[in-house]
Amino acid sequence: MKKIFTALLAAGCLVACTSKKTAYEQYTELYDNVVAQLETVEDRAAKDSIIDNFVTEGYTLLLENVQDVTSDSIVLNIFYMLSPEQKAELFAAIPAERLQMPVLEPVYKEYQIELKTSAGNPYIDITSLKADGSALSLSELVGKTEYVLVDFWASWCGPCRRLMPVLKELYESYHPSGKLEILGVSCDRDEAAWLKAVEEDELPWLHIRDQRAEPYNPCDQYGISAIPTTVLINRDGVIVARNPNEAEIEEILNK
């Protein structure tokens, strides 16, 4: 009887162990549920709330299963939605040898570049082409006004386009007095789409477009993993904020 009971326990364990879902399978279920929810909602605020909850739940799942190698695929899916604090916690938890593997190495390198271009660091000079084909460098602007705001965006990016009225208001308020310059850095592949968006949104500041090849690759140089991304640089060439909101920008400019 004891042998039979032991055999049943072993069989039960085998079924339980083999039926346990991997971290990525659990994440896929979570993702599918969120997609289904989004299809039933029209309100933008409600959609944003669903996505925020998804990121929170996905990140929690990721941390709980960080030793599961299938979680590497979750990192690739969710990395671009994480906060700087979450990224720091995540990469500290992942075994160092996995960060050097082909799956995670690219996003880990992006994260390291983000760290180098976070608040408190000296800015990295970038150069790319304007609409007329001439080159413009960030170093030509830094020091000419109190602050330079670099805005990484694209014509196809809804949140980027919705940010433009805010930036226009800041520009109109602070540019005439020499407080603020803005440099738009487009991540568009399509030059015509970029130029059309600049014209449609009536953006009065300077613009360049990432050419996706050195030396005209500013998005790579600043580790841009999601847009819009803004970087605020002071007269001394020090980054004072990365992705500040409108209130934070105004607080800095009004000091």
Residue spans of the language-model regions?
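Conserved segment of the thioredoxin-like fold in thiol-based oxidoreductases
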Residues: 172-215, 224-227
